[in-house]
Curated annotation (Swiss-Prot):
It catalyses: small RNA 3'-end nucleotide + S-adenosyl-L-methionine = small RNA 3'-end 2'-O-methylnucleotide + S-adenosyl-L-homocysteine + H(+). This is Small RNA 2'-O-methyltransferase. Its cofactor is Mg(2+). It comes from the Eukaryota. Its EC number is 2.1.1.386. One of its GO terms (molecular function) is O-methyltransferase activity. Keywords: Cytoplasm, Magnesium, Metal-binding, Methyltransferase, RNA-binding, RNA-mediated gene silencing, S-adenosyl-L-methionine, Transferase. GO terms for cellular component: cytoplasm; cytosol; nucleus. It comes from Schizosaccharomyces pombe (strain 972 / ATCC 24843) (Fission yeast). SUPFAM superfamilies: S-adenosyl-L-methionine-dependent methyltransferases. Pfam families: Methyltransf_12 (PF08242).
C-alpha cells in the first residue's frame, strides 16, 4: 500500500514535523533515535542549528544492514572540514534489540519514528520502560501510521467501507505487526502517562487528505478531518526538565553493540561572535566578491580615480561563511541587532576601516540586497 502521492512527500513532511516539535521547548542537546534505520532523521539533525542545538546523537536499530547504511550516511566528509560547525557533535550508532537495552543514561529527547508498529508486545513494554522509566527524556516523539487513513490508499470509490476488520494485507508494509487507529494510539499514550504521571501527551501528525496530489476529488465526499493524519504523532513532555546529559552505555557486557562512533570537526570559538568579528567576516565576504567580479574597478578605487558602488546579493554573504550564517541566526534582521548604530543612522550607514585602509562608507539593506559604497583613503 503506497504513500508516495503526497506533496511534499510524506517522509519529508514527517522529518520537518519532528524537527519543528524539537524546536518547541527545552533545548535539545542530546537525542536518541530508536529504530533509526538508515539515519534519515539523524542526518537531518547534523547541520549546526541554534534552534535545535544538538551536540550528541545516538541511533539504535536491530538490522545490521540499516546500521551500515546509517554509518555511511553520517560519515564525516570533506565539506564538513570546509564548513565547520560552531558546536561539537558526537554520534554513536548501536546495533541490537531494545529489550536488551537497559543501562542507558538520560537524553534530552527520544524519537521513535515509524518504529512501534514493527514491535511485538514484549518489545513495546521494553520500549516504555527504557524511555519513560530509564532515559526519562524531556520530550519523546512517537510517530506511527494511522490505520483509518488506509482506506484512502485502497482507493475505494464510495469511501464508505469499514476498516474495523484488519489483517496484515490491509497494512501499509508487510513487516508491520499492527497499525493503530487514532483511538487506539491515544489509549496507549494515555496509559503511559498514567503509569508515568510526570509525563503529559499531545497529539499531532502530518499528511492530510488535502496534501494528496489527487486528494481534491476525495474531499468532495468526506472532509479531511474524517480520516485524520496519515502519520499520527504523540508528543510526550516531562513536567520537570532534567539537566542535559550525553547518553552512553554503562554496562560493557550488554548485548548491544556500539557499531560506530563519529565525531564531527568544529571551531572552538565563543558564540555569538563579537560585533568586530562579525564585521570582519562581512568585510571579507565583500572583498572576496569585489576581487572576483570587480577587480579592475577596485584598482581604480585604490588609485583614487573613482568610488565604487556594488550591489552584493545577501545570498553571497550568507554562503561565504558558516560564522556569518550563525551570526545572522537564519534571519538577516539579526544584522541590525548586532549593529545598533545602524538603527540610529538616518541612512542606515556605517563607516568601517580595515587593514587595507579601505573604508566601507555606506551599507544599505534593501530587499535582501546590500549596496556597498567603497572609498579609498590614504
Amino acid at each position: 500500500m503506497g504513500v508516495s502521492s503526497f506533496y511534499p512527500p510524506l517522509h519529508v513532511q514527517r522529518r520537518r514535523k519532528l524537527f519543528k516539535i524539537l524546536q518547541g521547548g527545552f533545548p535539545v542537546r542530546s537525542l536518541l533515535d530508536i529504530g533509526c534505520g538508515d539515519a534519515r532523521f539523524l542526518s537531518y539533525l547534523v547541520p549546526c542549528n541554534d534552534q535545535v542545538p544538538i551536540e550528541f546523537l545516538a541511533g539504535i536499530d536491530i538490522n545490521e544492514q540499516s546500521i551500515e547504511r546509517a554509518t555511511e550516511a553520517l560519515q564525516v566528509r570533506t565539506e564538513d572540514f570546509l564548513q565547520l560547525r560552531w558546536r561539537p557533535l558526537h554520534i554513536e550508532l548501536l546495533l541490537g534489540n531494545i529489550k536488551d537495552f537497559t543501562h542507558y543514561k538520560h537524553v534530552d529527547a527520544v524519537v521513535a519514528s515509524e518504529f512501534i508498529e514493527h514491535c511485538q508486545v514484549a518489545e513495546i513494554l521494553a520500549f516504555e520502560k527504557l524511555v519513560f522509566g530509564n532515559l526519562k527524556p524531556n520530550v519523546c516523539v512517537v510517530s506511527t501510521p494511522n490505520f483509518e487513513f488506509n482506506t484512502i490508499f485502497e482507493k475505494l470509490s464510495t469511501l464508505t467501507s469499514s476498516i474495523s476488520s484488519r489483517t496484515s494485507t490491509n497494512f501499509r508494509h508487510p513487516e508491520h505487526v499492527f497499525e493503530w487507529d487514532r483511538k487506539e494510539f491515544a489509549k496507549w499514550a494515555y496509559k503511559i502517562c498514567k503509569r508515568y504521571p510526570e509525563y503529559t501527551v499531545e497529539f499531532t501528525g502530518c499528511g492530510l487528505l488535502n496534501d494528496l496530489i489527487d486528494g481534491d476529488d476525495l474531499l468532495h465526499f468526506r472532509p479531511s478531518s474524517t480520516y485524520g493524519f496519515c502519520t499520527q504523532i504523540a508528543v510526550f513532555h516531562q513536567s520537570k526538565n532534567n539537566a542535559a546529559s550525553h547518553c552512553f552505555l554503562k554496562d560493557q557486557n550488554s548485548s548491544i553493540l556500539l557499531y560506530k562512533k563519529i565525531t564531527y570537526p568544529f571551531m572552538e570559538q565563543l558564540f555569538p561572535p563579537t560585533v568586530q568579528q562579525f564585521m570582519n567576516l562581512l568585510k571579507k565576504a565583500f572583498f572576496d566578491h569585489l576581487f572576483g567580479r570587480h577587480c579592475l574597478l577596485l584598482f581604480q578605487v585604490i588609485a583614487g580615480k573613482c568610488a565604487l558602488s556594488v550591489k552584493l546579493p545577501f545570498l553571497f554573504i550568507w554562503e561565504s561563511s558558516p560564522l556569518i550564517r550563525h551570526a545572522f541566526h537564519y534571519d538577516d534582521s539579526i544584522y541590525l541587532s548586532y549593529c545598533p548604530e545602524l538603527k540610529k543612522s538616518k541612512h542606515k550607514g556605517i563607516a568601517l576601516a580595515n587593514s587595507f585602509s579601505f573604508r566601507i562608507a555606506k551599507v544599505l539593506k534593501k530587499s535582501r540586497i546590500f549596496i556597498i559604497t567603497f572609498h579609498h583613503y590614504v
